[in-house]
């Protein structure tokens, strides 16, 4: 009689443990994906490949504004392929496109070959494969229809793909985190627990980067601590009616945004147009007086912010503990203020390696055992790491091949989005499987065989 009861209890405990592990793994992979470095300052072309509906094309300016759209059919015939290449070349010339974001879905192999043929004629441009996970779901939502009422659902996905290269965080926050597809067993775990864990990760990432109060979308603003969907929409509506914000405190005039919400959100909101230089930084308004006092103690003024290269040395000479006491703050707050004053408006993503751009394509048949390649980590799961090496089929680095010493989980060595060097172990063309190793492969400053994980 007791055996079935014990079995149920044990099974329930193991299921709970497995659920927690799957949720933890998803959250662990989601953070580096959201924190991928943006590719700023470039006119970008987004391509959403397809067969029957064609390849959707969108050109966006450096701010993400749509400049032009088109639909080409490179898979229909040789004539249509030539016509597609000419259309893309004409768009690239007209808008001076330097970067192409190519979705990794249906027909991406044929489209990539076309892009490479185009880039042989257009020197100076490069492309990158971008995950289009969740793009189709987003483009059919009321949010996408509100943002792009004049565009067809299919064209919206091309815009989303282009923007994912320019600023992954700003675009991915519009998508349900579960649809991004960087976990394992996400459809088998309790949905409520998964939602709570992933929402927390998204909010942490948005708050770590900060948002520009005058350019942020409602999707981005609602992820800021203290704000919600209603106040985010009200901020955008106020901005459209009254023009750009010129001070942080001006956000208090937004309907339904009270003092308490302001106190929570203020440190994460940036106002580059403000005459108060501290509004450009992550220093909280409550710490403005302390920041000014600190500058005075070190022989600086507010006008010097942005050129405080000697601030850490001067603070060390004065005495950090003494300065903290004089400013009426604790040491952690002092360190935060110094970091923000030295790099006002800093974006932690800029300190990470830039995405790997390509100009040519590899085929599966080109791979040979022993070849050393550079790739991008696409997913980290319990038994290994999937790496995109540019052949339309991610290669697997088994956990035993990640580094030279024993590790309990691949996440101890790599994260989603890391640029890694791998060697080909085996290629099975028939089953389209690629076995890779990172052991003994000379590194390039990233994750080498000693498993020194890059801080994110």
Short names for language-model regions:
Residues 375-378, 417-432:
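Flexible glycine-rich surface loops and low-complexity tracts that mediate binding to linear polymers
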Residues 1-40, 294-359:
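Extended, charged alpha/beta regions that create polyanion-binding interfaces
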Residues 407-421:
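Short nucleic-acid-contacting surface segments enriched for D/E, G, S/T with interspersed K/R
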Residues 387-403:
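OB-fold (S1/OB) nucleic-acid-binding surfaces
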Residues 429-448:
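OB-fold/S1-family single-stranded nucleic acid-binding modules
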């Amino acid at each position: 009689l007791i055996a079935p009861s014990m079995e149920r209890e044990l099974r329930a405990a193991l299921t709970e443990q497995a659920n927690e592990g799957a949720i933890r793994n998803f959250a662990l992979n989601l953070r580096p994906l959201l924190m991928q470095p943006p590719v700023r300052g470039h006119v970008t072309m987004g391509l959403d490949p397809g067969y029957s509906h064609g390849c959707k094309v969108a050109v966006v300016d450096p701010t993400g504004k749509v400049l032009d759209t088109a639909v080409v059919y490179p898979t229909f015939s040789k004539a249509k392929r030539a016509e597609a290449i000419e259309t893309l070349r004409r768009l690239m010339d007209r808008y001076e496109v330097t970067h192409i974001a190519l979705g990794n879905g249906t027909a991406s192999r044929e489209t990539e070959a076309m892009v490479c043929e185009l880039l042989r004629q257009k020197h100076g441009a490069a492309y990158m494969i971008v995950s289009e996970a969740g793009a189709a779901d987003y483009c059919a939502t009321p949010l996408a229809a509100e943002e792009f009422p004049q565009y067809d659902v299919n064209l919206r996905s091309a815009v989303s793909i282009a923007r994912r290269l320019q600023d992954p965080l700003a675009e991915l926050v519009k998508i349900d985190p579960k649809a991004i597809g960087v976990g394992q067993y996400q459809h088998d775990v309790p949905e409520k627990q998964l939602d709570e864990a992933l929402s927390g990760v998204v909010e942490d990432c948005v708050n770590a980067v900060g948002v520009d109060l005058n350019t942020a979308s409602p999707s981005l603003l609602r992820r800021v601590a203290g704000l919600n969907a209603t106040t985010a929409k009200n901020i955008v509506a106020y901005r459209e009616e009254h023009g750009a914000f010129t001070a942080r405190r001006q956000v208090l005039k937004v309907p339904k945004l009270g003092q308490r919400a302001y106190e929570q959100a203020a440190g994460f909101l940036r106002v580059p147009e403000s005459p108060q230089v501290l509004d450009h930084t992550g220093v909280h308004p409550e710490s403005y007086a302390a920041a000014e006092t600190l500058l005075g103690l070190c022989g600086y003024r507010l006008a010097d912010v942005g050129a405080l290269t000697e601030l850490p040395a001067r603070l060390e000479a004065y005495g950090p503990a003494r300065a903290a006491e004089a400013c009426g703050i604790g040491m952690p707050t002092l360190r935060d203020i110094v970091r923000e004053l030295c790099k006002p408006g800093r974006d932690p993503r800029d300190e990470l390696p830039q995405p790997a751009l390509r100009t040519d394509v590899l085929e599966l048949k080109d791979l040979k055992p022993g070849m050393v390649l550079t790739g991008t980590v696409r997913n980290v799961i319990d038994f290994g790491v999937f790496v995109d090496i540019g052949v339309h089929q991610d290669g697997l680095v088994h956990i035993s091949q990640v580094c030279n010493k024993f590790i309990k989980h691949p996440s101890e060595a790599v994260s989603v989005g890391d640029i890694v060097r791998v060697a080909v172990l085996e290629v099975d063309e028939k089953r389209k499987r690629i076995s890779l190793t990172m052991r003994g492969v000379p590194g390039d400053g990233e994750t080498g065989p000693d498993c020194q994980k890059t801080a994110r």
